[in-house]
Swiss-Prot record:
InterPro entries attached to this UniProt entry: Ribosomal_uL15, Ribosomal_uL15/eL18, Ribosomal_uL15/eL18_sf, Ribosomal_uL15_bac-type, Ribosomal_uL15_CS
NCBIfam families: rplO_bact (TIGR01071)
Protein name according to UniProt: Large ribosomal subunit protein uL15
One GO term describing the cellular component: cytosolic large ribosomal subunit
Gly residues compositional bias, start-end: 23-35, 42-52
UniProt lineage: Bacteria, Bacillati, Bacillota, Bacilli, Lactobacillales
SUPFAM superfamilies: Ribosomal proteins L15p and L18e
Amino acid sequence: MKLHELKAAEGSRKVRNRVGRGTSSGNGKTSGRGQKGQKSRSGGGVRLGFEGGQTPLFRRMPKRGFSNINTKEYALVNLDQLNVFEDGTEVTPVVLKEAGIVRAEKSGVKILGNGELTKKLTVKAAKFSKSAEAAITAKGGSIEVI
């Protein structure tokens, strides 16, 4: 037996079903689309949420709430993420972005108190949670609101 004589095992390679190739193929004429109607046509079909002309559920439900255009969205950083820095480092939003901890600054950076801080750092951010503030100062570090 040579390399060019190798064949796939019987039944291991299934032949793709080609529709619309004659009635004797089993999938000719209507190509598995049933009889006439919107769904049988080329490009036919109904949009997402369409209920046959009946007022759809999303329009029957009342509107609720609103989006406040003045909402400030902060980039959130937890304490355990700050352990990548050396002792005595001044951590600013720019430094956090360079380190890959923060992608976009948004309305500024907020430091949260999840995890444990093991380094003494000077942290500058727009906001601090009370637990984060306490943890940073407990390690001998300092905080500055910018």
